[in-house]
UniProtKB/Swiss-Prot annotation:
It comes from Rattus norvegicus. It comes from the Eukaryota. Belongs to the type-B carboxylesterase/lipase family. One of its GO terms (cellular component) is lipid droplet. SUPFAM superfamilies: alpha/beta-Hydrolases. PROSITE patterns: CARBOXYLESTERASE_B_1, CARBOXYLESTERASE_B_2, ER_TARGET. This is Liver carboxylesterase 1F.
C-alpha cells in the first residue's frame, strides 16, 4: 500500500520523459497525463502513446451546437492509455468502416459517445521537451458522418520517421454540422473542433517532443476536405505550416452547401420540434437525448444513395456551410482572391476512387448490376443534384465515359469513373491549380496499388481504390501479417515522402524517386509498384468538364465543379 502511494505521488509531482522503465507522464496546460510505451517488431525505437487526451470540454447540454470550449483542468494524473469513444454515429456502420480501414493487426471494439473531443498522440519514446520533432495532425474521413481517430495507429509512422503523430476527433453528423443558417446555430461545429485541436497542439505538443512551429495537417476523403477547408479559413492562421489532402478537397460534392434550411427543417420535423423560428428548433433539439438524435441520423440514412428514392429531396450529408466564421466567403471566391493560408500543399487522388469501397458503402451501381445506356442515364439523373451537374448534360457525359461501348460492364465502369472524376479527380486538380497560382509550393500524386489487406469481395481489377493509400501512409504492411516485400517497401517510401514534407515542405529526399513540384507543366507523381513522374493528371477529363460546364449557367443551391 505504501509503495503504491509513493508511486502515485511520484507520478503526480514529476514529468517522466523517454524512460521506458516507467510509464511516460507529461504535463499539459490542464493537467498531467499518463501514457504507455509500445514496441514495434524489428525497430529499436519504441513509441510513447497517449490515448484519449481531452482538448475541449464535453460538448453536452448547452454546448451542443456551440463552439468547443477549453477542457476543465484536473489535479490528478489522468490515465490516457485506452481508446476514447468515437463521436456519435451509426455504430454498425462505424465499426464496419473501422474494420475495413484500420492499419492495425487486431480488431478493436469501438464505443461511441457525444462526449468525444479527444485526441491520440504517438511520439518516439526518447522524446524530451527539447526534441522539437515535426508534428503530423491526422483528420479522419467518413463523410462527416462516420469515423474516428483510433482507427489509425500512428506508431509506425512515428517510429520509422521520428515524428509526432496526433490523431484528432471532431463532432459528426447532426452534432457536428447542424445549421439553421443564422446566429442560433451557424454550423461547422466539427470544423471548430478541428481548430480547437490545433490550438491545443500549439499550447501542448512541445511537452510531447513536438515542434509547434512545424505542424502538418493531413487527412483523407472528408478529412482531406477538412484540410482544404482549414487551408482557406482565417481561423487557422499560424496553427499549421504544411497540408496534405488525400482524396478530398473543398469542392468534394455534397460536403459544402449554400442552403441549410431544408435539412434543418427536416431534422426538426423528424424530432417532433416546432419550426416557427430557429431559436425554437435549436432549443428543442438540445433537449433531445443522444439516442434520439442518433435515431434521426439513422432514418436520414446519410451517405447512402438509392436509385429507389428521390435524391433531390434527400440529404446524403450534413454539410459544411459558409458561416462567416470558419469560411468567410464561398471557397471559390477565397481561392480566386488568393486570400488563404498559402502553405506548402500536397494534393492527391487514387486511380479508381469509385472502384469498390464507395459504391459498396453508399449503395450505388452495385457490381452485379448490368446497365445499358438508358439505365445509366436514368441512374445518374437521380444523383445529378448531389454532384451539382445539370441533368441535361448527363447524356453527353455518358457518351464520353462509355467510350462507344454498349457492353454493360464497361458502361457500369464508365459510370464509376464518371463519379470518381466529378467527386475527386477534377476538384483536386482545380484546387491544386488555385494553390499553385497563389504562389504556394504544390505537389500532386496519383496512388495506384492493390493492397493485400483489401476485402475478399473486392474485384481484382480495382487498383487504387478510395482509401487504399491509407494502408501505405500508416504502415499497415509493417503492422499486419501477409504483406509482400514490395508492399512493405511501398509503405516505407510513402511514409518517407509524407514525413519529409512534414519536416521541410518538400517530399523529396535521398534514395527516393524525384517528385516534381506542380507548376505550369503540371508534373505529378504516380505512386505504386512502379513510382514515376507523369504530367497533366486527368488532363482530358478536366478539359472535358471545364468546357461542358462553361456552357451552362450556375444552378441554384448546388456545388458545381
Amino acid at each position: 500500500m505504501c509503495l503504491s502511494f509513493l508511486f502515485l505521488v511520484s507520478l503526480a509531482t514529476c514529468v517522466v520523459y523517454g524512460n521506458p522503465s516507467s510509464p511516460p507522464v507529461v504535463d499539459t496546460t490542464k493537467g498531467k497525463v499518463l501514457g504507455k510505451y509500445v514496441s514495434l517488431e524489428g525497430v529499436t525505437q519504441s513509441v510513447a502513446v497517449f490515448l484519449g487526451v481531452p482538448f475541449a470540454k464535453p460538448p453536452l447540454g448547452s454546448l451542443r451546437f456551440a463552439p468547443p470550449q477549453p477542457a476543465e483542468p484536473w489535479s490528478f494524473v489522468k490515465n490516457t492509455t485506452t481508446y476514447p469513444p468515437m463521436c456519435s454515429q451509426d455504430a454498425a456502420k462505424g465499426q464496419r468502416m473501422n474494420d475495413l480501414l484500420t492499419n492495425r493487426k487486431e480488431k478493436i471494439h469501438l464505443e461511441f459517445s457525444e462526449d468525444c473531443l479527444y485526441l491520440n498522440i504517438y511520439t518516439p519514446a526518447d522524446f524530451t521537451k527539447n526534441s522539437r520533432l515535426p508534428v503530423m495532425v491526422w483528420i479522419h474521413g467518413g463523410g462527416m458522418t462516420l469515423g474516428g481517430a483510433s482507427t489509425y495507429d500512428g506508431r509506425v509512422l512515428s517510429a520509422y520517421e521520428n515524428v509526432v503523430v496526433v490523431a484528432i476527433q471532431y463532432r459528426l453528423g447532426i452534432w457536428g454540422f447542424f445549421s439553421t443558417g443564422d446566429e442560433h446555430s451557424r454550423g461547422n461545429w466539427g470544423h471548430l473542433d478541428q481548430v480547437a485541436a490545433l490550438h491545443w497542439v500549439q499550447d501542448n505538443i512541445a511537452n510531447f517532443g513536438g515542434d509547434p512551429g512545424s505542424v502538418t495537417i493531413f487527412g483523407e476523403s472528408a478529412g482531406g476536405f477538412s484540410v482544404s477547408v482549414l487551408v482557406l479559413s482565417p481561423l487557422t492562421k499560424n496553427l499549421f505550416h504544411r497540408a496534405i489532402s488525400e482524396s478530398g478537397v473543398v469542392f468534394l460534392p455534397g460536403l459544402l452547401t449554400k442552403d441549410v434550411r431544408p435539412a434543418a427543417k427536416q431534422i426538426a420535423d423528424m424530432a417532433g420540434c416546432e419550426t416557427t423560428t430557429s431559436a425554437i428548433i435549436v432549443h428543442c433539439l438540445r433537449q433531445k437525448t443522444e439516442e434520439e438524435l442518433l435515431e434521426i441520423m439513422k432514418k436520414m440514412n446519410l451517405i447512402k444513395l438509392s436509385s429507389q428514392r428521390d435524391n433531390k429531396e434527400s440529404y446524403h450529408f450534413l454539410s459544411t456551410v459558409v458561416d462567416n466564421v470558419v469560411l468567410p466567403k464561398d471557397p471559390k471566391e477565397i481561392l480566386a482572391e488568393k486570400n488563404f493560408n498559402t502553405v506548402p500543399y500536397i494534393v492527391g487522388i487514387n486511380k479508381q476512387e469509385c472502384g469498390w469501397l464507395l459504391p459498396t458503402m453508399m449503395g450505388f451501381v452495385p457490381a452485379d448490376v448490368e446497365l445499358d445506356k438508358k439505365m445509366a442515364i436514368t441512374l445518374l439523373e437521380k444523383f445529378a443534384s448531389l454532384y451539382g451537374i445539370p441533368e441535361d448534360i448527363i447524356p453527353v457525359a455518358i457518351e464520353k465515359y462509355r467510350k462507344g461501348s454498349d457492353d454493360s460492364i464497361k458502361i457500369r465502369d464508365g459510370i464509376l469513373a464518371f463519379i470518381g472524376d466529378v467527386s475527386f479527380s477534377i476538384p483536386s486538380v482545380m484546387v491544386s491549380r488555385d494553390h499553385r497560382d497563389a504562389g504556394a509550393p504544390t505537389y500532386m500524386y496519383e496512388y495506384q496499388y492493390y493492397p493485400s489487406f483489401s476485402s475478399p469481395q473486392r474485384p481484382k481489377h480495382v487498383v487504387g481504390d478510395h482509401a487504399d493509400d491509407l494502408y501505405s501512409v500508416f504502415g499497415a504492411p509493417i503492422l499486419r501479417d501477409g504483406a509482400s516485400e514490395e508492399e512493405i517497401k511501398l509503405s516505407k517510401m510513402v511514409m518517407k515522402f509524407w514525413a519529409n514534407f512534414a519536416r521541410n515542405g518538400n517530399p523529396n529526399g535521398r534514395g527516393l524517386p524525384h517528385w516534381p513540384q506542380y507548376d505550369q507543366k503540371e508534373e505529378y507523381l504516380q505512386i505504386g509498384a512502379t513510382t514515376q513522374q507523369s504530367q497533366r493528371l486527368k488532363a482530358e477529363e478536366v478539359a472535358f468538364w471545364t468546357q461542358l460546364l462553361a456552357k451552362r449557367q450556375p444552378q441554384p443551391h448546388h456545388n458545381e465543379l
